[in-house]
Amino acid sequence: MVEFPSLSPYWPLIRFLVPLAITNVAIDLGEQALNRGIATVKEDAVEMLASYGLAYSLMKFFTGPLSDFKNVGLVFVNSKRDRRKAMFLLVTAGVTAFVLHILIAYTDLGYYIINKLHHVDESVGGKTRKAFLFLAAFPLLDALAWIHAGILLKHKYSLIVGSASISDVVAQIVFVAILLHSNLECAEPLLIPILSLYMGALVRFTIVGLGYYCNIHDNIPDTSGLDVGGDATIKKMLSFWWPLALILATQRISRPIVNLFVSRDLKGTSEATEAVAVLTATYPVGHMPYGWLTELRAVYPAFDKNNPSNKINASSPVTKSHIKKFTFCCLALSLMLCFVLFWTPHVSEKILVDVIGVDYAFAELCVVPLRIFSFFPLPVTLRAHLTAWLMTLKKTFVLAPSSVLRIIVLITSLVVLPYMGVHGATLGVGSLLAGFVGESTMVAIAACYVYRRQVSSPGWTQQLLTVYPSSVGRGSLLIRSKQLCLS
């Protein structure tokens, strides 16, 4: 009779990740709701979708680095003093992003970035800069929510984080529906998705803020004890945050770069506007089945034995081996979802028509780009799993080169593929996939480097001799080291 291993160690992982996965999917659904708010506008819908898509993707470049304060809260915030230091860094970065938004909206810098580089006409360029101005305060509001989400995750309150994100999306959908019946549709249609975006973020910030103050604020010390290394310094937070911020910035700038090259490749014609609109519509739909895999980055730090919330329950059955197997199952599920949604005939078209509200002819243009998205889960899972391990070790500095390689591979693909007959949205998504593969490869190399440094360090050898005093010889030590690192 076959005996199945106990599933009990996996329930904490499932309970932790499911709300985060729902969070990620909810964000994509929110994007689709915002796109629908524009697509429903009958006059110049494609032009409006392209303008909002350009502004939104540029804005995401700023929200990306700031949203990684979630990981600062997850790894570093053990006391009220740690939180104050993290908030100081966050507000400084948010104000900087606000000023840059104003400069891009009102100066020749914005005209050059949007009109000249993207080769869009005056109408699209003007609407894009206006939308970018309206979005100036969003990065700071978004980051305030994320840092408290990270603190909640540290204490395993992922359900509150997931509920906040679902409420965010519900608020966006409700406000889109309300504003579509207002005079904004005629006066300023761009404000429909933008105001809905702000209201959703405000709801999310309110929920995670209340969750923090009701469940955590009074239960953490004013200062960190020596058992967790004392209070974190601003320097340590910065050195931990900047590689993650750089990586996320390059991930977020990838979309504007893709929009830029796709638009220039088609030389600013109506086909270029259509291609950017296709990319705007396919990004959230294609991202939905695999985007939640990124949340695997939070698993290792949350279940790390050095996490103060885990020291209370030292008998937790979750091991590194359980996390690896759980990660593989998540990958398999994501691949299955991608191939069912994007390769089953007419399913992806129906999603685009029914959810976003585009016409069927436009939806058919999105089929091939969506099928390319089916291969994204592989590099995303590898990157998330290894990044989580490096975050636990606080060795994020080795991840910085991966962002550089991602941009190099992305731009190379965008330049080379048109000579092979690939154009439009297919060019954009295919180049994104190449960039993901390049980035994940570099992350794997960085993880191998850190692993070998750990194994060869004198302290590591002493730890092995302490744990396994009967082991004699280098061969036995190497075997034991693999057991400790990888099991």
From Swiss-Prot:
Molecular function GO terms recorded: inorganic diphosphate transmembrane transporter activity; phosphate transmembrane transporter activity
GO cellular component: plasma membrane
Major place of residence: membrane
Membrane topology: Multi-pass membrane protein
Domain of life, per lineage: Eukaryota
GO biological process: phosphate ion transmembrane transport
InterPro entries registered for this protein in UniProt: ANKH
Record key words, sorted: Membrane, Phosphate transport, Transmembrane, Transmembrane helix, Transport
Localization of this protein: Membrane
One Pfam family per UniProt: ANKH
Ranges that cross the membrane: 7-27, 86-106, 132-152, 159-179, 190-210, 326-346, 362-382, 407-427, 428-448
Bridged cysteine pairs (disulfide): none
Function: Regulates intra- and extracellular levels of inorganic pyrophosphate (PPi), probably functioning as PPi transporter.
Family designation: Belongs to the ANKH family.
PANTHER family xrefs: PROGRESSIVE ANKYLOSIS PROTEIN HOMOLOG
Protein name: Progressive ankylosis protein homolog
Species: Tetraodon nigroviridis (Spotted green pufferfish)
Upper classification of the organism: Eukaryota, Metazoa, Chordata, Craniata, Vertebrata
